[in-house]
Amino acid sequence: CLKAPKLLREGGVGEDIIHSVVSHGYGITIGCGVTLDVAPEHEMEKVLFAADELTGLIWAAALMRPSKSVMDMEVSSIKKKFKDKRFAAGCSRDTIRTGAENLGWELNELFDKTLRAMQSCEAEIQEEMKQEERS
């Protein structure tokens, strides 16, 4: 991620997109001990920051369901998994909370909007998972 801005510039990507890519890791300390310090400023950047960790938690919860799907999931299921710090322990609850705060949203609103977005692209997610299994 420290190399991302350089690589993106070399690829002709605009500074606004580069800022968005880099800011989604704001405050996270990476393997080399560097803490990323580009704060999300625009709403899209804040949504990306908030949803990145949360989608991991939601997907982990979906994989534990008999359906292996988010289609039959409710916000109450996400809340329950969010409270269990052992579940999807690699998904930072603090980052999710900070993301909701940055957006001015309650956690329930972030959970609901993220779940609905994931439900809207369930077919594509499932197809990507199948392709990954084949490779």
Identify what each model region corresponds to:
Residues V70, E74, A88, N102-E106, ...:
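Short amphipathic alpha-helical interaction segments
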Residues F82-L103:
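Charged/polar, low-hydrophobicity segments characteristic of intrinsically disordered regions
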Residues C1-F87:
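Divalent metal-dependent catalytic cores for phosphoryl transfer on phosphate-bearing substrates
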Residues T98-S135:
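Charged phosphate-binding loop/patch that engages nucleotide di/tri-phosphates or the phosphate backbone
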Residues I18-V21, R93, F111:
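Short loop/turn and capping residues at structural boundaries
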Residues L7, W59-A62, S77, T95, ...:
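Alpha-helical scaffold segments in soluble metabolic enzymes
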